[in-house]
Amino acid sequence: MLHGGDYNPDQWLDRPDILADDIKLMKLAHTNTFSVGIFSWSALEPEEGVYTFEWLDDIFESIHRNGGRIILATPSGARPAWLSQKYPEVLRVNAERVKQLHGGRHNHCFTSYVYREKTKEINRMLAERYGSQHALLMWHVSNEYGGECHCDQCQHAFRDWLKKKYNHDIKSLNDAWWTPFWSHTFNDWSQIESPSPIGENAVHGLNLDWRRFVTDQTISFFQNEIVPLKEITPNIPITTNFMADTHDLIPFQGLDYSKFAKHLDVISWDAYPAWHNDWESTADLAMKVGFINDLYRSLKQQPFLLMESTPSAVNWHDFNKAKRPGMHLLSSVQMIAHGSDSILYFQWRKSRGSSEKFHGAVVGHDNCSENRVFKEVAKVGQTLEALSEVTGTIRPADVAILYDWENHWALQDAQGFGMKTKRYPQTLHEHYRAFWERDIPVDVITKEQDFSSYRLLIVPMLYLASEETIARLKAFAANGGTLVMTYISGIVNESDLTYLGGWPKDLQEMFGMEPVETDTLYPGDKNAVRYQNRSYELKDYATVLKLSTADPEGFYEDDFYADTTAVTSHPYKQGKTYYIGARLSSQFHRDFYGTLIKELAIQPALDVKHQPGVSVQVRQDEENDYIFIMNFTEKRQPVVLASAVKDMLTGETLAGEVTLEKYEARIAVKAKE
């Protein structure tokens, strides 16, 4: 298990005493791995063609001598001032067409030939110098890729991308974008500009294609970066760090990570949940953390790396609350439980100045190993040292939930339904919750992935569904799978054009019904659905359904569609489909999926009884189940185990009732029968 984090010795080159202290403190913190060089370009190449690698040589030597490993970063995330000054074409232009000044970070043009050559040049020198170092564990390519540039270079590249996509046929583009609307038809490629608040932003096909282009252009930049790395160090794995927001742990929307993941050896991501916030319970947030971990793990169906986290507080929330005692270990254990093989931090040592000087770190401005934060980090390190056999293990799942970046983009862009109540990822959370609370493993997959290994596939709010995706869903159900779909699904194709003639025929055949009208509700509107003799509150959306061969399962209680069907089921060839026509409560999802779980004989991770707020997750290999029992509540909780397991930290046998203290986690192993 990797334990360590983002180390910035280039900020302390005039303080050899600090650098010496770092090595000593790394041992005390039970750390073993450090990502180095992420923002070090100006320290590596202070003037064009003048290289100063000696300080990095020393860091490699000292960390290796200390028994540590290095994840070496390429420095493209922040360039030196001389580069911006001499080559202003590397500067990004924003959507308002304003050229940015040098400063900040992550603000370069991904299309710039000069910047691509300069990054490849420095990357080659790093690979040649450090590629054979025993301490080199992995390449960390750039940092948190994101953003977009609207300069002339990017406009030309976008037009070339469009020409390729539409086979140099501008009529095909006009058809796909529905440009006769508002007289927006193009008759020459040169007329097309990227979306802008001071220009075109109402053509949804343009907006969608621009986002696709930004993803492809960023991947192209990444591929340019790794050319020398693959050439010189073909056996060193490559990653870059993905992101999510901090409020609801929504996947980063600037790039389609499902595309990016195909080009990485290992998925890594930066997690900063707002623990102890005042808008939700700790368990609610833990559920969302579980969801995003399961998404990023599922991208490659293998363990991922937690590349960044904070051992205490961040510095960029509205309220930067410190983790309470015990929460750092608990939140770290949760990451491991859902598939991480690392706990890495930003940052190892707090900066003395600038914008991140108050961001949490292992080592504070006091340079002390006796404070609470450092001791809790050391405890995490000791825990990870006992979990080495968990590294590389997997989390098989019978249940999958489908998340799609392009669908998210298109749905958010749609000027319809409830502008503030679409809440696509939050809706997926509510379906995921019904399984997380039952300790049933879930894969969160994308539309390109193989569906065949799952028994239950849940597809909420798939507004954008291409004919290809519909055909794959149809094949899943036909071959024996159970498929659940919801309101606002199957509305538009891959160009964000609505399907004509009603719901797509393949969906009508699969579900035995057709949605004919979607009612969008005000927050104060009241209605409910009767399902299995219980009433469940609905909000935001209610879809009127026209049944053909489907079986009605739930009924609306009020409004002009009272007593009509809200929930359906339908046998389809060897499988079965369900349609949920309204946004219903968490209790509905618990009961609805509870029925399916019984019918499909889907088993939880472990036979265990506990109260809400306790989560049990399992990783496994051919011989053992590795069991993580976590208390995300603010009070002591009893957990009743149906069979004995061995505590991996203490060696004791756990059986029957086990008590977990507030924020406590127990990690156990059980041999497979």
UniProtKB/Swiss-Prot annotation:
Annotated Pfam families: Glyco_hydro_42, Glyco_hydro_42C, Glyco_hydro_42M
Residues reported in the UniProt entry to bind substrate: 105, 143, 316, 356-359
Binding site for Zn(2+): 109, 149, 151, 154
Enzyme class: hydrolase
Biotechnology: Has potential for partial lactose removal in food products and improving the quality of dairy products by increasing their solubility and sweetness.
Record note on pH: Optimum pH is 6.5 for both lactose and ONPG hydrolysis. Stable at pH 5-8 and most stable at 6.5, retaining more than 90% and 80% of its activity when incubated at pH 6.5 and 37 degrees Celsius for 5 days and 1 month, respectively.
Family: Belongs to the glycosyl hydrolase 42 family.
Quaternary context: Homodimer.
Descriptive protein name: Beta-galactosidase GalA
Originating organism: Bacillus licheniformis (strain ATCC 14580 / DSM 13 / JCM 2505 / CCUG 7422 / NBRC 12200 / NCIMB 9375 / NCTC 10341 / NRRL NRS-1264 / Gibson 46)
Phylogenetic placement of the source organism: Bacteria, Bacillati, Bacillota, Bacilli, Bacillales
Gene for this chain: lacA
